[in-house]
Amino acid sequence: MPNKSPTRTLYALFGGTFDPIHYGHLKPVETLAQQVGLQHIILLPNHVPPHRPQPEANAQQRLKMVELAVAGNPLFSVDSRELLRDTPSFTIDTLESLRKERGAERPLAFIIGQDSLLSLHKWHRWQSLLDVCHLLVCARPGYAQTLETPELQQWLDAHRVFDPQALSLRPHGAIYLADTPLLDISATDIRHRRHNGESCDDLLPRAVQRYIELQGLYRG
């Protein structure tokens, strides 16, 4: 029998506006790391998200909150390249840049939520994503489990893997739907709470909460 491809270290990228970063971002991906054997997660704060309203916090404030949220946690690092752009942040551009840096053979994954999977066909060059990386999908409360059309569902089914070890055997091309905790926390809810003078202490790391207070962010 031919030998299996050697297992390589799996790295993952997790992008977002992070306005602000909160436990709904962090806890599911920490669980995901345990499930699939992730050695490292690179957080990628977006500068100008193409599909969303402009963030309330500026780029440097959002970067600082992300850095504070994961300080001292060896699972995470922060990549600020998207914040240096003056143009919209397209995921495929960043992934192709990172792929060139890390070589063609290293397994690379991009983490998204179930909500993003459902709208993935609206992303810029979405069909090129699996040519560059794997997709790791975290469950999100209240979102459908099937895609919009039979064609999209067939695309998902054709690339889906059920054994997370398969992600480390090839550099890209697979989709894994993870069983992560469903935390009904959103940045929108946190901003609304702040606008209304309500506490957010249980929704985000203490260091991030202190920074928000010091900067006077998300006040009504």
From Swiss-Prot:
It catalyses: nicotinate beta-D-ribonucleotide + ATP + H(+) = deamido-NAD(+) + diphosphate. The keyword Ion transport does not apply. Keywords: ATP-binding, NAD, Nucleotide-binding, Nucleotidyltransferase, Pyridine nucleotide biosynthesis, Transferase. Its EC number is 2.7.7.18. GO terms for molecular function: ATP binding; nicotinate-nucleotide adenylyltransferase activity. The keyword NAD applies. SUPFAM superfamilies: Nucleotidylyl transferase. It holds the Pfam family CTP_transf_like. GO terms for biological process: NAD biosynthetic process. Pathway: Cofactor biosynthesis; NAD(+) biosynthesis; deamido-NAD(+) from nicotinate D-ribonucleotide: step 1/1. Belongs to the NadD family. Catalyzes the reversible adenylation of nicotinate mononucleotide (NaMN) to nicotinic acid adenine dinucleotide (NaAD). HAMAP family: NaMN_adenylyltr. PANTHER family: NICOTINATE-NUCLEOTIDE ADENYLYLTRANSFERASE-RELATED, PHOSPHOPANTETHEINE ADENYLYLTRANSFERASE. NCBIfam families: cyt_tran_rel (TIGR00125), nicotinate (nicotinamide) nucleotide adenylyltransferase (TIGR00482), PRK00071.1-1 (NF000839), PRK00071.1-3 (NF000840). This is Probable nicotinate-nucleotide adenylyltransferase. It comes from Yersinia enterocolitica serotype O:8 / biotype 1B (strain NCTC 13174 / 8081).
